[in-house]
């Protein structure tokens, strides 16, 4: 079996795809798209910062196009469809990351992962995290 991408490469790919789709679909909100889709960032704090920046670009693109009533340029009939695609795309890679960790003997239980994923995604603004 051929080895798949590393966890760092998966995070780099997620960041890249976000920025590429913003560039193609709402260029007025575009940020610099990395040259290499799979180039791993060795500094985890820097990778987290990059992921936050690309998430902001997606948010700005969707929000801007909804506010203006304008569709996306290339891929989607409605801006919400871009957000939907990002959710399932990143959910797919979230599963890959959990599998890589498990195969490497570093499995994360649902009890450990829940507060860091579902607990963040489902938290209402201003509410305390569930532990």
Please place each PLM-identified region on the residue numbering.
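Short, contiguous alpha-helical
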Residues: 1-36, 73-131
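Helix-adjacent hinge/juxtasegments
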Residues: 20-61
């Amino acid at each position: 079996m051929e080895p798949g991408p590393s966890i760092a490469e998966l995070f780099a790919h997620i960041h890249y795809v976000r920025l590429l789709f913003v560039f193609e679909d709402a260029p007025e909100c575009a940020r610099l798209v990395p040259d290499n889709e799979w180039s791993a960032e060795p500094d985890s704090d820097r990778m987290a910062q990059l992921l936050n920046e690309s998430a902001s670009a997606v948010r700005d693109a969707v929000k801007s196009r909804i506010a203006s009533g304008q569709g996306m340029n290339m891929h989607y009939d409605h801006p919400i469809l871009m957000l939907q695609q990002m959710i399932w795309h990143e959910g797919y890679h979230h599963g890959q990351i959990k599998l890589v960790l498990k195969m490497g003997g570093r499995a994360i239980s649902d009890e450990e992962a829940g507060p860091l994923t579902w607990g963040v995604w489902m938290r209402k603004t201003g509410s305390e995290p569930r532990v």
